[in-house]
């Protein structure tokens, strides 16, 4: 992806993006690699054109089908947690949505395998990756709760919708030393963003923040 091709003007300009990055830094995002990715990946291309002027607000936005693109702080913090120790070679993402989170990871050099259960969103995300020449992102239409065993093990797993608990198949696909970042709690319950690490065969869990995500649902549509 050539960031210079997608600078935008007005409310999508580089100056607007820089203001967002400054705000994220003020709110605790420290990793300069993550801040650079947020600066360079054109979030306005991952939302409806009518919402482009709000793309660099630190807020979630609707993307249709009852789904949202996460607020930039959440994307930045989840990314920061995944790459804290090293850039993972392969990451599995459950819940492609618009594709923005996957694009941020790909900008950082990660090979991303992402699954979306809503066909229209999967098709749109796949086309965006082609348009942006993000060849490291592989989009699959399907039920993410089963993971994507074909490309396992993953050094990172990121869940962008909230399950009650982490789906069991994902544990078999997380590499030793790998990290899983997910919002847990499901619909109608308080949710917490957690980091789970596999260390010497054991799973170590850490609470990161209180969050609000759409629920992780099974099946496809």
From Swiss-Prot:
Compartment list: Cytoplasm
Pfam assignment, any one: PCMT
Keywords carried by this UniProt record: Cytoplasm, Methyltransferase, S-adenosyl-L-methionine, Transferase
Catalytic activity: [protein]-L-isoaspartate + S-adenosyl-L-methionine = [protein]-L-isoaspartate alpha-methyl ester + S-adenosyl-L-homocysteine
UniProt record, GO biological process: methylation; protein modification process; protein repair
CDD domains: AdoMet_MTases
EC number from the UniProt entry: 2.1.1.77
Molecular function as annotated in GO: protein-L-isoaspartate (D-aspartate) O-methyltransferase activity
Highest taxon in the source lineage: Bacteria
Gene Ontology CC: one annotated term: cytoplasm
NCBIfam families listed in its UniProt record: pimt, PRK00312.1
Biological role stated in the UniProt entry: Catalyzes the methyl esterification of L-isoaspartyl residues in peptides and proteins that result from spontaneous decomposition of normal L-aspartyl and L-asparaginyl residues. It plays a role in the repair and/or degradation of damaged proteins.
Family: Belongs to the methyltransferase superfamily. L-isoaspartyl/D-aspartyl protein methyltransferase family.
Protein name from the UniProt record: Protein-L-isoaspartate O-methyltransferase
Taxonomic classification: Bacteria, Pseudomonadati, Pseudomonadota, Gammaproteobacteria, Chromatiales
């Amino acid at each position: 992806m050539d960031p210079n091709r997608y600078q935008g003007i007005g409310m999508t300009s580089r100056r607007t993006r820089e203001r967002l990055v400054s705000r994220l830094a003020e709110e605790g995002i420290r990793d300069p690699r993550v801040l650079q990715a947020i600066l360079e990946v054109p979030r306005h291309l991952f939302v409806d054109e009518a919402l482009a002027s709000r793309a660099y607000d630190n807020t979630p936005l609707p993307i249709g089908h009852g789904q949202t693109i996460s607020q930039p702080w959440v994307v930045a913090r989840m990314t920061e947690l995944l790459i804290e120790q090293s850039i993972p070679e392969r990451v599995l993402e459950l819940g492609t949505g618009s594709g923005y989170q996957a694009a941020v990871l790909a900008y950082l050099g990660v090979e991303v395998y992402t699954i979306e259960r809503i066909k229209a969103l999967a098709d749109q995300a796949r086309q965006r990756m082609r348009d942006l020449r993000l060849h490291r992102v592989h989009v699959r239409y399907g039920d993410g709760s089963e993971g994507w065993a074909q490309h396992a093990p993953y050094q990172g797993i990121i869940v962008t919708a909230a399950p009650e608990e982490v789906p069991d198949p994902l544990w078999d696909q997380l590499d030793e030393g790998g990290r899983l970042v997910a919002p847990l709690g499901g619909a109608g319950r308080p949710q917490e963003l957690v980091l789970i690490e596999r260390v010497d065969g054991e799973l170590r869990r850490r609470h990161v923040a209180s969050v609000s995500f759409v629920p992780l649902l099974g099946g496809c549509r």
